[in-house]
Each structure stands twice: as structure tokens, then as C-alpha cells.
């Protein structure tokens, strides 16, 4: 474990954790556990849809992205669902989205919106398809970059530019706010 304030664990810390685990009494369960499959994506995607529809003031059956072409570059990471299970059902045309199937070898480009080749990939996708918007995710979908068409070219919104755009949206909704970021 590592934190910016406390730093990483020292050898003594790790030794203490291992000793604690070794000494812990793990009682035998009264009955045997079970293995199974649980669908976590459907409730997650439905929750995202509800948040989007609510934020846009739309009814549950509306398709607020109808008429918009939105391309996604998932970089063969976990973000492919975003195009097929979220944007498309909300009405977006996702034709031209790329690398939606997870592949841990990442054969197309590094799945990192801060990587120049990756950003070039989503910029090309927006230009080639005439998309209204492009979004690129990292491997585990906790970072993103965005692309907007502009006068025959594109504007890449990564790192601070994306934070600035989100801040502008939030200021309109909530008034003055404080934003803390480590995206520099």
C-alpha cells in the first residue's frame, strides 16, 4: 500500500500484517460455501443510465442521445460495455467505436488516455466517422479522455482540459466550487 502522505509500508509493517494473519483464528463454517456467477454489470449499467436520464431530465424510456454519433475507444480494456450497453441503448450511434473487446495483450495501442498514440486513435476515429464526440478509456475505466470535432479537426480533452470542462459544467449547476486534482 502507498499513500502520498504516509508513503509505503515498511518491512516491519508487512511482517506485522503477516504475523497477524498467521495468528488469526479462522473458524470452520457451519456449512460449506457455494460458488456461483453474479451479474454485476446489469445493475451497474442500469444505475448509470438512471443517473444520465435524471441529470438530463428525461423519462426512463427516452433516448437522449438519438441523433448523436459517439465513438468509444476502449483500448481492449474493460470499457467496451460503455458503448454497447450504455450509449447505444440511450440512442447514440456508436458506429466506428473501436477495440471494445477486452484483450489483456492490448494489441491495438496502450490503453491509456494520456498516451499520445491512444489519443491519436480516438482523434482518428472521430475524424473518420464524423462523430459528434469521442471518448477513450484506460484499462479499468477509471480514467478517460474525450475528443470534440472542431473546424475540420478535433480538440482533444485529456487531463486538465477535461477537468476544466467538467468544472465549467458543475459551476453552472452548483455555483462556485473548489476542484482538487492531481492530473498535472
What are these model-derived regions, one by one?
Residues 1-129:
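Gly/Ser/Thr-enriched, mixed-charge loops and adjacent short helices
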Amino acid at each position: 500500500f502507498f499513500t502520498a502522505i504516509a508513503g509505503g509500508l515498511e518491512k516491519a509493517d508487512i511482517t506485522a500484517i503477516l504475523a497477524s494473519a498467521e495468528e488469526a483464528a479462522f473458524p470452520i463454517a457451519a456449512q460449506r460455501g457455494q460458488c456461483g456467477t453474479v451479474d454485476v454489470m446489469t445493475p451497474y449499467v442500469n444505475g448509470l443510465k438512471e443517473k444520465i436520464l435524471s441529470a438530463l431530465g428525461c423519462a426512463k424510456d427516452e433516448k437522449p442521445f438519438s441523433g448523436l454519433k459517439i465513438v468509444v475507444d476502449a483500448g481492449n480494456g474493460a470499457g467496451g460495455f460503455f458503448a454497447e450497453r450504455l450509449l447505444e441503448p440511450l440512442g447514440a450511434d456508436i458506429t466506428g467505436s473501436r477495440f471494445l473487446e477486452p484483450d489483456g495483450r492490448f494489441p491495438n495501442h496502450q490503453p491509456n488516455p494520456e498516451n499520445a498514440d491512444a489519443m491519436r486513435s480516438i482523434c482518428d476515429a472521430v475524424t473518420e466517422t464524423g462523430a459528434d464526440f469521442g471518448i477513450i478509456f484506460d484499462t479499468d475505466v477509471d480514467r478517460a479522455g474525450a475528443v470534440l470535432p472542431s473546424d475540420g479537426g478535433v480538440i482533444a480533452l485529456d487531463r486538465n482540459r477535461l477537468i476544466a470542462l467538467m468544472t465549467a459544467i458543475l459551476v453552472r449547476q452548483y455555483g462556485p466550487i473548489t476542484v482538487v486534482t492531481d492530473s498535472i
